[in-house]
């Protein structure tokens, strides 16, 4: 997908990887970048607008844990203004295994609800034009960081959900792919806790692991968007962008 002249919604587009990716998107010249985030960051919004004044950057407050009806109401407002939306990026996430229910609510349920809501506008069975979804998951969705099993499981759930969305594309007209960053230098990694405090030094230990910068990760994120490959499972690790070949161990046969 050429980003130029497209309308893009980015959920949590002001965080570490999210903000740098938003910068990369704006440089590529979309028509509109709509950022939905829990906390407004006027300085970041101003920076995005300054990068490319031709791009309309808009912010709406959004908490992914709100009821589905509220998400649909917000999207109704956005679609009424833009008429069409080409890409939804689901990027909300927390890493806090002390907060089990909140982790699942933000990392998985909120993403599913946002996706479900936009289907009202995109699903070709309802006369919609289709669209594309990029879900930010994690390499922990492939192989868990076992000291943070709740976070890892929530990301594995999103990888699975996204793969199902991709297979449903012939029915819905909506393609999907997953973005799976490796360990990246963000506040998410530098300060968090393990489940039941099984490893108090987990953040410190991960900090010793080979990492990448948010700039490296975001550059590859933009490349994945431009590739627009339905069903792709992208690994963004150590400054590289690689497609993961998923091993099938079972098939429902339907």
Curated annotation (Swiss-Prot):
Name of the featured protein: Alcohol dehydrogenase
Alphabetical list of InterPro entries matching this protein: ADH_Drosophila-type, NAD(P)-bd_dom_sf, Sc_DH/Rdtase_CS, SDR_fam
Enzyme class: oxidoreductase
Biological source species: Drosophila immigrans (Fruit fly)
GO biological process terms held by the UniProt record: alcohol metabolic process
Entry EC number(s): 1.1.1.1
Family recorded in the similarity comment: Belongs to the short-chain dehydrogenases/reductases (SDR) family.
A molecular function GO annotation: alcohol dehydrogenase (NAD+) activity
Organism domain of life: Eukaryota
SUPFAM superfamilies: NAD(P)-binding Rossmann-fold domains
Annotated positions binding NAD(+): 10-33
Binding positions for substrate per the UniProt entry: 138
Gene: Adh
PROSITE patterns (UniProt xref): ADH_SHORT
GO cellular component entries: cytoplasm
Subunit structure: Homodimer.
This protein's UniProt keywords: NAD, Oxidoreductase
Active site positions, chain numbering: 151
Keyword Lyase: no
Taxonomic path: Eukaryota, Metazoa, Ecdysozoa, Arthropoda, Hexapoda
Catalytic activity from the UniProt record: a primary alcohol + NAD(+) = an aldehyde + NADH + H(+); a secondary alcohol + NAD(+) = a ketone + NADH + H(+)
């Amino acid at each position: 997908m050429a980003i130029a002249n497209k309308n893009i919604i980015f959920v949590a587009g002001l965080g570490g990887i999210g903000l740098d990716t938003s910068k990369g998107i704006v440089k590529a010249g979309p028509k509109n970048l709509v950022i939905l985030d829990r906390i407004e960051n006027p300085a970041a919004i101003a920076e995005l607008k300054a990068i490319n004044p031709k791009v309309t950057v808009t912010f709406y407050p959004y908490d992914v844990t709100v009821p589905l009806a509220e998400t649909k109401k917000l999207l109704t407002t956005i679609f009424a203004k833009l008429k069409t939306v080409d890409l939804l990026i689901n990027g909300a996430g927390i890493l806090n295994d002390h907060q089990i229910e909140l982790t699942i609510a933000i990392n998985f349920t909120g993403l599913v609800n946002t996706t479900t809501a936009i289907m009202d506008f995109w699903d070709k069975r309802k006369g919609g034009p289709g669209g594309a979804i990029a879900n930010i998951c994690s390499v922990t969705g492939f192989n868990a960081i076992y000291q943070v099993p709740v976070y890892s499981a929530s990301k594995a759930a999103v990888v699975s959900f996204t793969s199902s969305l991709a297979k449903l594309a012939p029915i819905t007209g909506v393609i999907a792919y997953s973005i799976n960053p490796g360990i990246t230098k963000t506040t998410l990694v530098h300060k968090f806790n393990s489940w039941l405090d099984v490893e108090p030094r987990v953040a410190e230990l991960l900090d010793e692991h080979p990492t990448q910068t948010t700039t490296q990760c975001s550059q590859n994120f933009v490349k994945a968007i431009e590739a627009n490959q339905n069903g792709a499972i992208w690994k963004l690790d150590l400054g590289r962008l690689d497609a993961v070949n998923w091993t099938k161990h079972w098939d429902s046969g339907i």
